[in-house]
Amino acid sequence: MNASAFHRLLKTSAPAGLGPGPRSGVEFLAALNRAVDAALKEVTRDKRRSDLVRALILLWHDHLEASHVIAQRYEDDADGSYVHAIVHRREPDYSNAKYWFHRTRQHPAQAILAERAGELLGDDPTLRGVLMPRGKWDAVAFVDACEEAEIGRASCRERVLQVV
């Protein structure tokens, strides 16, 4: 797999915001789709996987509607539901995000998130306790924390939540 192609696609001047954007440094949709086509051609012929990777890259570049359309195609799939939840979290449609996270049950991505987020949250034991009760990632608590940061109740945590 040519990971560097995907790293380039995710390179932006700032992390994605907690809300829908827009922000500077993101690619235009048509150019981004061409770049995603080229990168995916090298790594997989699995349409579902390709589509979901595309949805996540489009979402990273603040193309929420295009990402949402793709995620909706895979609503009955755990990976598709997880992507769908992330899209709704960014919109922000918090209750819908929680619905889709509940549908995914205990998605395998949550173990990876717990490990990586744990490193980032080391300096904030309170937030760590909220997002990772008993050491496991809680996607619904993450949605709640993002909502609180977005409405100004926890602005000091916004940057940490963006990186997570």
What residue ranges belong to the model's regions?
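N-terminal alpha-helical interaction modules that lie
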Residues: 1-77, 91, 103-159
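TPR repeat positional signature
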Residues: 51, 81-84, 88
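Structural register within alpha-helical repeat arrays
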Residues: 54-55, 84, 96
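Extended hydrophobic/aromatic segments used for targeting, binding, or gating
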Residues: 78-79, 95
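Conserved alpha-helical segments that form or flank metal/cofactor-binding pockets of metalloenzymes
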Residues: 93-100
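Hydrophobic alpha-helical segments, chiefly the membrane-spanning helices
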Residues: 160-164
